[in-house]
Curated annotation (Swiss-Prot):
The protein, known as: DNA polymerase IV 1
Binding of Mg(2+), residues: 49, 142
PANTHER family linked to this entry: DNA POLYMERASE KAPPA (PTHR11076:SF33), DNA REPAIR POLYMERASE UMUC / TRANSFERASE FAMILY MEMBER (PTHR11076)
Gene Ontology cellular component list: cytosol
Species, as recorded: Rhizobium meliloti (strain 1021) (Ensifer meliloti)
Catalytic residue list: 143
Keywords per UniProt: Cytoplasm, DNA damage, DNA repair, DNA replication, DNA-binding, DNA-directed DNA polymerase, Magnesium, Metal-binding, Mutator protein, Nucleotidyltransferase, Transferase
Catalyzed chemical reaction(s): DNA(n) + a 2'-deoxyribonucleoside 5'-triphosphate = DNA(n+1) + diphosphate
Cofactor(s) recorded in Swiss-Prot or TrEMBL: Mg(2+)
GO terms under biological process: DNA-templated DNA replication; error-prone translesion synthesis; SOS response
Phylogenetic lineage: Bacteria, Pseudomonadati, Pseudomonadota, Alphaproteobacteria, Hyphomicrobiales
Amino acid sequence: MIDSAAPPSGFCRDCLKEQAAHSRRCLACGSPRLLRHSELYRLTLAHIDCDAFYASVEKRDNPELADKPVIIGGGKRGVVSTACYIARIHGVRSAMPMFKALEACPQAVVIKPDMEKYVRVGREVRAMMQELTPLVQPLSIDEAFLDLSGTERLHHDPPARTLARFAKRVEQEIGITVSVGLSYCKFLAKVASDLQKPRGFSVIGQAEAADFLKAKPVTLIWGVGKAFAATLERDGIRAIGQLQTMEEADLMRRYGTMGRRLYRLSRGLDERSVEIDGEAKSVSSETTFNDDLARQEDLVAHLRGLSEQVAFRLRKSALAGQTVVLKLKTADFKTRTRNRRLESPTRLADRIFRTGLQLLEKEVDGTKYRLIGIGVSDLVDPDLADPPDLVDPQASRRAAAEDAINRLRDKFGKTSVETGYTFGKGRRGQ
């Protein structure tokens, strides 16, 4: 451990040489990319995020794009999946309708997403992460939390230096860049990784956490989206520092269980650990009936509820799927599996249900079923999901309604809101 009263020690991110306390450039290589912090060698929890991932992969593979604004996305009816940093200077943002993006940056090069390639590169980065520590929690194809506690013996370096070496290796061997956030908890590690993109490495220590957060907007807190931020603003709460002055009981009285999160995260308190999960190949939900069912209306009643469960899990896992899979098991234990690939990925219960219903209608022929399941496969980044549908103008309204329902469920619990398909229906076996 280092003395917090001593001048911050640190190292050069380019050559990894230790640095004098007050030098402004590396004494060995001349680089200005010096990393110093009084807690630098004590912190072990990191968030790693690839910089403008899809666009960076395309620029790597086509050097002619290096100095050009690049947008990854669909056609004019689609939305922006990723924009490189040059395009972002012109105001292009993820999830922006493509026509607006091209109005903001008409000279942009638009590239259709190549998900197979991105997944392949993402797995290369993930494999390098797992060489650092077994405690890797992927959040999406291009980002993850890492807990490097106890890895000093393995790497002969504290986590900060191990992470800097990792970032250099990704850049040299894979050809893209990453940004690193290092802290003592997941919330602030993720916040830190966004502070100096691209090629960033930012540190937030425990001693400075409350002061660092004080002036930040409430939207920085995990789980505070636009709708909930508007609720807080109506109550006169805009900055995290205002939450720091409030009692936990008061926040819980006003905002339910979300109030406890506001109280703790506003103070930099986050005990969540890095969770190891195998990489999901699909997300699904199924139910076995107490009595065999043959009528379409009975099967549909279950299908809708299962679709909502799948959508809920996709949203919580920050995933979307491009192929909808229907599973049926007959009364004599024979399994039927049907699937349909969508034009664009989805994470919406409505699209999952409607596609599943089309598949189900072809299987309702008097056969009795003892089980029904619905799921999605070909999992991708949620930024690619559910572009606006100009052919079906009601699709956007249904999506907006589903988002509103999800926000209510996040605030009051999964069973707080029922749709017309599930309200009053039995849930046997679920």
